Amino acid sequence: MLRNLISRHPSIAICGETRFFADIYKRRSAFGPLDNFENRERLVDQYLSTARVHRLGLDVAALRQRLLDEATSYPAFLATIMRFNSDFRSKERCGEKTPHHSFCTETLSEWYPGAFIIHLVRDPRDVVASLQRMKWAPKSIWNNAWIWTLFNRGAERSRHRPGYLLVQYEKLVASPEAELARICEHVGEKWPESLSVADEESTPYSWPMSARGPVTRDRLQKWRDQLTPREVSLVERIAGERLQKYGYESNGRAASPSTVVHALAVAGYEMVRQRVVNLPYMWFYHTQPTNLPLHEYWKFRRAWKNMFPDSAPPNGRAK
């Protein structure tokens, strides 16, 4: 949601999820230095063949040529995608939003001196309640609560940077114009007073309608209806001191030992299940570069995943 709101600014374009570090940088040993044209071409063609890139709403053919011309290093690869996105939308300034990049904010700050890091935080109980409904997310409360904790811990590593800014989701939806003005001031821009965020605006990015529609408070504290008291106690136990640190009040109920043991069992089941489901990905990842056509890999991966229906383990939820 924040990405789409900021991208309404006439000078700023925030690119969708590139997953640069997971899909590209971690595999740099397989592709080699990008100042070699053959290495660069192989990486560009493989990356641009993924569905994720097409969801960015860009001219993929033009992006390919731009990457071949300019992406002579891994930092330049990501920068080229961001710059192409802003040029494509006739904007002057660029940015990118991938949640997993919260673990890499220090690397990004070193690559791009003067970069701004906007750390968006939300009530962990609402985050977990939302993740429980996502097909791609873990099915256990324990694992989803740790996702919130680890992602925020990663982003906190750059709080000493001048470019770091903490934004609270609840304040953003309560006073969107005021928060957007604060963000713009932080990055050296001014939020146009005539620009309203009250109305729904179309977006070039493919993402759930909840993230693309008008700003609403309807999703605040949904956890009260969607999580059981024991699940809430688990989330608060894992969130720990960060719950109060970010301004959220505890529900006041401690998780019992039996609740923790049960949650760990469910989390363990889910972890093993996900490892099995992801076996094709791990194989493909560790055998790069490979001559296997990408469409054949995706065909096999989908068939493999269909063998494991998306379902929680028996009695997987804490009552």
Q: What is the meaning of each model-derived region?
A:
Residues 65-72, 138, 142, 170, ...:
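Charge-dense, low-complexity intrinsically disordered segments
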Residues 4, 16-18, 119-122:
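Glycine-rich, histidine-containing beta strand-loop boundary motifs that form or position
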Residues 1-12:
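A conserved segment at the C-terminal end of the G1
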Residues 27-29, 82-214:
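PAPS-dependent sulfotransferase catalytic domain
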Residues 13-96, 101:
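PAPS-dependent sulfation machinery
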Residues 27, 156, 189-319:
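PAPS-dependent sulfotransferases, especially Golgi type II membrane carbohydrate sulfotransferases
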